[in-house]
Amino acid sequence: MRLHHVQVACPPGGEDAVRAFYADTLGLVEVDKPEPLRGRGGAWFRAHDATGEVVAELHVGVEDPFVPARKAHPAFVVDDEAALDRVVSRLRDAGHDAVDTERFTFPGYVRVHTVDPHGNRVELLAPSG
């Protein structure tokens, strides 16, 4: 068994903001939703490793009423601390906070937390050492 995707939500009309955040800022690749699901709104994204293999998929669905996920969250692993620092720089350049007060609290990784434009928590990790 393996994980196929994680889903978070956005409010109606929030797709452009999630595209800017997950694709432009974090570097995920938007993929087309299957035709039968397109009418629901939202957006789907994939993360790839250095070989091009899909290693994570994030689905953003529309919810009304919308409540952001403050505790439950996707956690994306980047290659190394330098890559994490580059993502943090892109986040901050785009006006997003990147909180690193728990940077050294997860054994084997360094990490930061941020929130997407709709308040959903997102974790970014890199192998330490």
Question: Which positions does each model-derived feature cover?
Answer:
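Short, charged/polar, Gly/Pro-enriched secondary-structure boundary elements
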Residues: T51-L58, G119-R121
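A short beta-turn/loop motif at secondary-structure boundaries
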Residues: E35-R38, D64-F66, R103-P107
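Short amphipathic alpha-helices in soluble, non-transmembrane regions
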Residues: A20-D24, V87-R92
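Core segments of cupin and vicinal oxygen chelate
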Residues: A9-V55
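Vicinal oxygen chelate
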Residues: L3-P12, A43-H48, P65-R90, A94-G129
